[in-house]
Amino acid sequence: MSKLKDTLKKLWRNEPKNLGNLHQDKTGILKHREWRGISDTAYDYYRWLITWKDIIVMAGKAPVSTVKGLMSYRWMASYLSAPAWVDRHTEGLRGPQLRITHLHMNGLVKPTTDIINFLLANDKHFHKNSKWSDRTVNVDEIFSSEIMAGFPNLKDNHVSTIPIFLTSMVDQQITPPYLDITEGYGVPADVCPLPSAEAGVAINDDYPMVGKCAITCNMPCDGSVMNSAYIDRRFNIPTHVLNVPLRYNGEDVQPYAVDEVKSMIEFIEEQTGEKFDWNAFFAAMENYNEQLEYEIQKWEINKTDYPQMTGATFWLYRLFYFHISGGMDERFLKIDKKVNKLMLDAYKKQTKCSKEMRHRAIVWSCPANYYTSLANWLENCWGVNVVMDMETMISYIQYDTSDKEKALETYAKTLQRTTMRKHTKGGYANVVDELWRIVDEYNADMVIMYDQISCKGMDGLVGIFDDQARERGISFIWVPQDLMDPRTISRRDMRENINKYMTTVLQEEPVDPTLVDFDDTMAW
C-alpha cells in the first residue's frame, strides 16, 4: 500500500533529475518540456501559454507598429524568446516555488509587453504626431520612478531598459552587435559593456523616439555618465542632470540631494506645463510602502531554516518593480499578495525550496545580464540556495505620506541606494561590512562574488574579501563575468569556475551530474 502511495505521489509531483538532458547542445533549446508530475507540469504549461498570450496581445494592440518595430530594431525580435527565458528560471522547481517564480516572472513579462506597446505606438520614427510622446519624460534605466507619481498626466520612459538592459537578460546574443558598433565608433573595448552597449543602440538609432524632455544622472558610474552624451545627442531634447551624492551615508549631503530633486521637479514642470500633484504622489507612496512591507516579509522568511524564495527571480522581480512601478502600478501589489500567501503557507509546512539544500549563499556584486539564471543552475546542480543578493537589498526606506519635505528627503535617499549603486558607492562599509552583516543575518556559509572584469569597482578589495572570508570560515567563490558580453567570459566559463571550487576545495559531488558541463554558447 505504501508503495502505491509513493508511486501516486511521484506521478502527481516528482523530484527533478537529469535536467541537463532536457536541452539540445549549444542552442539550449528544450527537446521537450520538463515532466514535473501531473500537477506541476499542467501548471507550468498553463503559465507558458499565459506568457505567449501576453506577447500576442501586445502585437494585437498595435500590429502595424509591432511589425515596424521588428523590421527596424535589432533588439525587438529578442523578446520573442521570452518564454524560453522564463523556462530557464523555473527549471527544476516544484510546488509553491514553481508558482511563486511564475507569478514573479509574469510580473516582468506583462508590464514589459505594455511598455513595448507604448513605445512603438508613440515612436516618432513611425508616428510623427504621437499623442503621448510629448507627454513623456525620459529617464535613465536605474532611475527610481516614484517622483513621476506626482505627475499623473505624464509617463516616464526608462530609455535603455527595453532596447538593451532587459533585452540582454532575455537574449545573450543581442548585446555583442551593439558593442561592436560602439567600438567601431572609436570607444575603447575595455569600457563597461553596459554603457558601451547603450551607446551602440544610440549610434545605430535603435531607440524609439519618445519624450518631451529627459532626466539624466551620475548613476551608477562614470561610464554611464559618458554614455549620457550619446543618448542626449540622439534624442536632442531638453535634458536636466540630476546629481546624486556619492558619499551618501552622512546627513550633511542630504540638503544638497533634496535641492537636486526640487530642481528636477521644476524642470519637468517647465518643460511639460504640468504641476506636481502631492495628493497623487502620496497615494502612490502608500502603495509603495505596502509593497515594501511585503518585500521585507520575504526577506525575513529567507533568514529562517526554511527559505521559500531562492534562485534569480527574487532579485529580477525586485529590480524591475523598484525602478518601473514607483507605487503607481498596482499589479505588482496584487502579485505580492498572492506570492506572500503562497510563501507563508509553504513556510508553515516547512517546505523545502529545492531537492537538496546543502549551502546557504549570498550573491554579491553586479550579476551578469547574460546569465540571470545562474542561481537556478547553482541550486539544481550543486544544492546551493541563494537566500539573498546585492541587487535585492537596494533602498527599503518607507515614505512619510504626510510631510512633503520628509517625502522628498526619502526620495533623495532612495536614489542614492538604487541598483548597482547602494553597495558600490559611499565607501568601504557599504560593500564589505554590509556583506558580512547580511551573511550573519541570513546564516550563510557561502558567498558567490561576481568579478565584473570591465569594472574597477571591486578591484581594490579582492584581498580584503578573501582574508575576511577565511577568518569567518565562509566559502568564497569568485565568478568572473563581463556583465553584457558573453564572448569574453561565457556562461560555461562561469559555471566552470564554480565547478572547480565545489570539486577541489569542498570536494562535493553534484546533485545533478548532467548539469555540471554543457555548451550553451548559441543559446538565447
State each model region's role:
Residues 2, 11-138, 262, 266-397, ...:
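A charged, amphipathic alpha-helical module
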Residues 100-204:
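An N-terminal, globular interaction/scaffold subdomain
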Residues 132-133, 141-180, 365-436, 440:
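Redox- and metal-dependent alpha/beta enzyme cores, enriched for Fe-S-associated oxidoreductases
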Residues 142, 372, 376-388, 403-414, ...:
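Hydrophobic alpha/beta core scaffold segments
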